[in-house]
């Protein structure tokens, strides 16, 4: 490694590798630099690439590197070394024990260019030398002059009043704010019943919450089906049978008996005997159901039917409403 003479006031950094120490090149370089420079600092390449290490900024006048052709983290080492060098300082890289250093020097040349070094020169003794730019402002000035063009900042065109265009007001920002509670409107509509659907003598409270009994599903396993079957066995049926009609003038007679259903289960039945043939109706709508009957109608509570038709009503029918 051919070293350039240094003054005793210059600070020099030597970065080497284990290969350079194995072949004795590192020890020879240390002796030569100690005799020529005032202050010599030595580090292995692993120390430089360590993320925890940061060399002093703008400190060294020259940096020498003795490295192998492979296994060097240039992207981590060169930026640190460049920051530790004073402007205009030189960096010299030498390859250790390489038979064909041309490919190595080409790689190092590219890495030095990427790191921002200038004045890169290659020597026959398998070494390459470069320098840190003297000033970043000078480099920028030179690049601008060489291209013959400079960046021109574009200005916004002013309007007729001499000022910049004003932002247009949003259309919805000029309208008054209106708040509508959709949920409250829906609840109010559900509670309100139109007058056309209510009769004068209707006593049903439509504002009260309605309940619906849950029915057992097809594959019920929670016991609800057993409860329904028990309720069905104990339920009362209301039958209107024209063959058992007795009395006159629409009179109504109730008889409670126990009968067996088609499946052999017993049911308590309340029979209501009504003479529909003798009943009179001023409205003619008594047989259409409770919605068309007066409050004093003798058929109030019975479903819609025709004279002579058999009707059966479970006593717990109101659970489904």
From Swiss-Prot:
The segment annotated N-terminal SAM-like domain runs over 1-140
Q: Where is this motif: Cx2C motif 2?
A: 294-297
One of its Pfam families is CIAPIN1
Similarity field: Belongs to the anamorsin family.
InterPro entries in the record: Anamorsin, CIAPIN1, Dre2_N, SAM-dependent_MTases_sf
Q: Would you tell me the protein name for this molecule?
A: Fe-S cluster assembly protein DRE2
Region of interest (Disordered), ranges: 128-166, 239-263
The UniProt annotation puts motif Cx2C motif 1 at 283-286
Function recorded in the entry: Component of the cytosolic iron-sulfur (Fe-S) protein assembly (CIA) machinery required for the maturation of extramitochondrial Fe-S proteins. Part of an electron transfer chain functioning in an early step of cytosolic Fe-S biogenesis, facilitating the de novo assembly of a [4Fe-4S] cluster on the scaffold complex CFD1-NBP35. Electrons are transferred to DRE2 from NADPH via the FAD- and FMN-containing protein TAH18.
Which residues make up the binding site for [2Fe-2S] cluster?
Answer: 202, 217, 220, 222
Q: Name one GO cellular component term.
A: mitochondrial intermembrane space
Query: Per the UniProt entry, what species is this protein from, by scientific name?
Result: Malassezia globosa (strain ATCC MYA-4612 / CBS 7966)
Picking any one GO biological process from the record gives: iron-sulfur cluster assembly
- Tell me its cofactors: [2Fe-2S] cluster; [4Fe-4S] cluster
Q: Where is this region: Fe-S binding site A?
A: 202-222
Chain intervals for the UniProt region annotation (Fe-S binding site B) = 283-297
Major localisation: cytoplasm
Gene3D superfamilies according to UniProt:
Vaccinia Virus protein VP39
Q: Which of this chain's residues are annotated to bind [4Fe-4S] cluster?
A: 283, 286, 294, 297
Provide the assembly information: Monomer. Interacts with TAH18. Interacts with MIA40.
């Amino acid at each position: 490694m051919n070293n350039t003479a240094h003054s005793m006031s210059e600070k020099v950094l030597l970065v080497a590798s284990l290969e350079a120490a194995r072949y004795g090149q590192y020890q020879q370089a240390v002796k030569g630099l100690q005799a020529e420079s005032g202050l010599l600092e030595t580090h292995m390449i692993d120390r430089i690439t360590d993320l925890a290490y940061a060399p002093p900024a703008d400190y060294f006048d020259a940096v020498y590197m003795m490295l192998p052709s492979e296994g060097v983290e240039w992207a981590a080492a060169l930026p640190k070394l460049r920051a530790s060098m004073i402007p205009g300082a030189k960096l010299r890289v030498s390859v250790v024990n390489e038979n064909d250093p041309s490919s190595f020097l080409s790689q190092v040349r590219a890495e030095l260019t990427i790191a921002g070094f200038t004045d890169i020169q290659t020597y026959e003794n398998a070494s390459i030398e470069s320098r840190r730019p003297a000033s970043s402002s000078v480099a920028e000035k030179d690049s601008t002059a060489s291209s013959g063009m400079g960046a021109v900042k574009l200005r916004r065109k002013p309007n007729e009043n001499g000022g910049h265009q004003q932002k247009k007001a949003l259309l919805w920002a000029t309208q008054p704010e209106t708040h509508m509670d959709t949920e409250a409107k829906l609840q109010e509509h559900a509670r309100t019943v139109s007058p056309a659907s209510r009769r004068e003598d209707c006593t049903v409270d439509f504002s009260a919450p309605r309940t619906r009994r849950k029915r057992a599903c097809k594959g019920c396993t929670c016991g609800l089906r057993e409860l329904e079957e028990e309720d069905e066995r104990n339920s009362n049926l209301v039958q209107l049978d024209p063959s058992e009609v007795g009395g006159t003038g629409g009179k109504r007679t109730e008889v409670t008996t126990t009968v067996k259903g088609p499946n052999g289960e017993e049911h308590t039945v309340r029979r209501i005997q009504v003479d529909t043939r003798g009943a009179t109706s001023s409205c003619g709508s008594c047989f259409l159901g409770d919605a068309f009957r007066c409050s004093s109608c003798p058929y109030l509570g019975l479903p819609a039917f025709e004279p002579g038709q058999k009707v059966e009503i479970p006593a717990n029918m109101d659970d489904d409403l």
